[in-house]
């Protein structure tokens, strides 16, 4: 929950001086990207900007305190402030910030600016006390903010120091409005107005001017003079003498003598006790002081001018002036040292009662009360965990002595889950083992339910580490004892069980487990696991050969991403990548490439090493188009990423696929042989990951003429794929078997497996898998089409594949261009009939398409002419070639190509 007072613009104080000259300057704020009000404490920065902001509905206000150095907290409040300013316009950014579902602050701000692109009115964001920010991550994000904010959005920063935000650059480009100490110092006229409002007896102009000069227009000093004069019934001149030459660093003694010592003991104690609060309301005051009239007390102090401000229009929330707050806290530590821990405990209890556990934790830490901190964590830690307050939880757990943590095994479990959620996978087992050993040493008993929760986490760790047997045992054991109320651990254990079945190739068992995981995760709003379950379902359906069903499952996942604002999570890249894989399989290459590039955009906010699979996907798209240069450029990027990085074997398999295909297309046997010597040979090919790597190996073996070895590999792959019903893998394997048999001159076997592959492709929709095999595939498909033995659906697919090969790989059709024809006609062995009665360029094109297996309608579509025109071209070229039907024309074209040195 966000504290409302931090998002409320300060209410104008009574008797404030309206500073018209400065307000006139602020009137031009909308013309600048940044307005910076930068001067020491006590010059009236907040009061001035609050005057200017009065009546503006399109303005958000964010009051900082020390806790806002946590990037997640900073982001939540900043977005909330802009939501208030825009009337709730930035719904998606708000959801991302609340759930912490963004890759970085800059990525979140980028989304914010997208949403604000259709907000056309001026918009203002005030951030008060920016000097409290010391986190470089936030500074860097705010530099991004200033570079990219919309033209109609102005940022107003109030700070005691110059913020490290590239101010000089903004100044040079005239995008900065600055106001400093010289501008904010009170003028003689403003000082006169100030004293007239506060003193019973009016002050002469020359006296107020002299006082103003003596304190150099410092508003706080003027306020202290007036306060001291009222409290001691002395003249303002006498009070001023005490302040001569005084500045903010020497205020403490003065405030003791002239402020604290002039209030009664009860009021003094009230002020000191309240100082532990960064903001306060009646309920909190009652907790700290035991007085029932807290609100009345605060209002009375405000009337006395004791540096206390209302923080919102409702008048419910108050805070001390920053200078006075710092002074009071120092005095509290001095005068109430023994009472201070109890005050922080009372404050923590007050915040808990109001429903703000994060603020309560701040006070428990300040009290060094580990028992209270432990109790807060036991009650609220999992809620904070599910709201992604990971940094705060880590601070709390680090503050707890380990023996206290171990005495509460739930906190030991939380610590391990925290490491898991922060992707510190290598630490999780270490934390669990240490906790187990400590609990054994201290004879701490863990009940069976909690042990099951530990098992669920251990199962997740095991599957991440590639240990499916251990993961299955732990997940099964966990599900035996987990009650329905332990929903998170049940989701984890169910997900792991499904993933284990997936890894073992038990797809019929894996799919319902992942569907169950999705339903449970949606019911309990664990949307990360719901998305993960959908991704797993899609991969399982792809493996089963149901690519259309997988595509529709991905649509559900995209819908979940949009609804729950998961766009910036790495899992969104995973979704885009497997969408790209399906689109590539179907030869929708432009869409496949777009999806991979969208994935790279998401990964721009993460380590470059994570880009490997998307870049490999781009290489595959280029290979399917026959664009070897572009494919090579992508693969060089992959090589850079692979160098010196330890990747999971599944990642390596996906990166190796385009490499071995590229070596096949370019005939680079040297690189292929070196890779084969070095690559890891996986174990049993019981899932599509293992099948993929063994296919890479078999492809290289075929390239190197190691036909017997390749046949052994492919026979085993096909046997496993049939047994486990890995239909897509079987489809891919058969295409490699076809290439093997073709190279071995076993044409009958090659044709048999190709026909089975075409039949399976009616289910999978595969096209590009055929296309990348190039000319050898084209020749075989032409022969099958000419035999006219293929069923209609397979025949249509074969013609589509041929068209793609011709389009992307410039095979037979490309040979009948003008240069080829010129060389053909001057060849000494060219038939005399063709030499004396040459075909037109268009007729040569038609002959090439006939040879490629195109029907008349397809030729008409390819050349964008009427079907009747194509019939005329065919009749003419038959006459010139001296042939009577299509089969003879194909044979004639084949002979011409062979004569010119092209294999037929």
Swiss-Prot record:
Top-level division of the source organism's lineage: Bacteria
Residue ranges of domain HTH luxR-type in the record: 832-897
Listed SMART domains: HTH_LUXR
Activity regulation info: Activated by ATP and maltotriose, which are both required for DNA binding.
PROSITE patterns for this protein: HTH_LUXR_1, HTH_LUXR_2
Single Gene Ontology BP annotation: positive regulation of DNA-templated transcription
DNA-binding region: 856-875
GO molecular function, one term: DNA binding
Entry keywords, A to Z: Activator, ATP-binding, Carbohydrate metabolism, DNA-binding, Nucleotide-binding, Transcription, Transcription regulation
Signal sequence annotation: none
Membrane spanning residue stretches: none
Record-linked InterPro entries: P-loop_NTPase (IPR027417), Sig_transdc_resp-reg_C-effctor (IPR016032), TPR-like_helical_dom_sf (IPR011990), TPR_MalT (IPR041617), Tscrpt_reg_HTH_MalT (IPR023768), Tscrpt_reg_LuxR_C (IPR000792), WH-like_DNA-bd_sf (IPR036388)
Binding sites annotated in the UniProt record for ATP: 39-46
Role noted for this protein: Positively regulates the transcription of the maltose regulon whose gene products are responsible for uptake and catabolism of malto-oligosaccharides. Specifically binds to the promoter region of its target genes, recognizing a short DNA motif called the MalT box.
Family membership noted in the UniProt record: Belongs to the MalT family.
Subunit structure: Monomer in solution. Oligomerizes to an active state in the presence of the positive effectors ATP and maltotriose.
Protein name per its UniProtKB record: HTH-type transcriptional regulator MalT
Gene from which the chain derives: malT
